[in-house]
A protein has these predicted regions:
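Anion-binding alpha/beta catalytic cores of soluble intermediary-metabolism enzymes, centered on
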Residues: 1-263, 268-327
């Protein structure tokens, strides 16, 4: 059963620092004030200290104890510039250019993670997804063995037993048309992410076909990806290609694929493309009354996550806990 309590317990045992790139935003300040009232997560706010203090005072949020770092007055800027130039040497970035780039809070905040000053980063309250993800790709980079960054949504709703029903859905936000091999990578990363939220992953590669009932290139892609994933992750329960009803409904599963250990019980869903994934998680959210947490970015060397520009302070607070717990 998933609850934020278990993530908070993880953080209490090993408190983390998280960077907020939009330190003056009232939603960020409200979330930071809530985090400061606890002892398991330490916020770092990027921006002008005077402007941040004024915004907090105007909004009535107590941010006493927050660490505020101003890119314009950072005592380790020379070190940051040198590292940035090394990371971007293939692009021929000069120190002067680096200083200009690092005046942007999204790049500056990402470098704080790269330098080990913070453990994770949460941005996107005012930045676009691209402006949050691009610095992460350039500076944090993907994990060894990974070729892409992908995303996962965690969906939660109370069940009839009183426990939470928890599902993982990928990739609903980043990769438009993932290849077979990219789908395999997405499945592995999503399964690992699911475990953090108390899910014992049973992975379904979704399609309009179940084990050969339909034909077409899209069917072949999901079937082949599922086969490759089974070979790569032999201890991970995987089925595919499979229709959604066969993946989640035991009665349908008994008819369509009675020998499958995943069919009827899947909880980690791999969509064929971003169209299906984005539509799918929003249907679950709006018609299925699931709370949706994400997108959680997967495949990076450190947790960097992106907020919706329409987020509220509660969503910032929740995503901060999720992001830090992944560190």
């Amino acid at each position: 059963m998933f609850g934020f309590g278990q993530l908070i317990e993880i953080l209490k045992k090993d408190p983390k620092k998280i960077v907020f790139t939009e330190g003056e935003d009232p939603r960020i300040l409200e979330a930071a004030s809530r985090l400061l009232a606890s002892s398991f997560l330490h916020p770092i706010l990027v921006g002008d200290p005077e402007k941040i203090a004024a915004s907090a005072e105007k909004s009535g949020f107590n941010i006493r104890g927050a660490e505020i770092i101003d890119p314009m007055n950072f005592d380790r800027m020379d070190e940051m510039v040198e590292l940035f130039c090394e990371l971007r040497k293939s692009k021929g970035v000069t120190p002067e250019q680096a200083r200009g780039i690092l005046s942007s809070a999204n790049y500056f905040g990402t470098m704080l993670v790269k330098m080990g000053i913070a453990d994770s980063l949460l941005g996107g309250a005012t930045y676009s997804t691209a402006d949050t993800v691009r610095p992460a790709l350039q500076l944090i980079k993907t994990k060894p063995g990974n070729t892409i960054v992908s995303s996962c949504f965690i969906l939660v709703r109370p069940s009839a037993t009183g426990e939470n029903e928890v599902l993982a859905m990928s990739d609903c936000a980043i990769n438009i048309h993932p290849t077979e091999d990219e789908l395999v990578e997405i499945a592995g990363e999503s399964a690992e992410c699911a475990k953090i939220f108390g899910i014992d992953p049973k992975v379904a590669f979704l399609s309009y076909s179940t084990l050969g009932s339909g034909k077409g290139e899209d069917v072949d892609k999901m079937r082949n990806a599922a086969h490759k994933a089974k070979e790569k992750y032999p201890n991970l329960p995987i089925e595919g290609e499979i229709q959604f009803d066969a993946a989640v409904a035991p009665r349908v599963a008994r008819t369509k694929c009675p020998q499958s250990e995943v069919a009827g019980h899947a909880n980690t869903f791999i969509f064929p493309d971003i169209n299906a994934g984005n539509i799918g998680y929003k249907i679950a959210q709006r018609l299925g009354n699931f709370e949706a947490y994400g997108p959680i970015l997967l495949g990076l060397n450190a947790p960097i996550n992106d907020l919706s520009r329409g987020c509220n302070a509660g969503e910032v607070h929740s995503m901060a806990i999720i992001t830090a717990a992944l560190a």
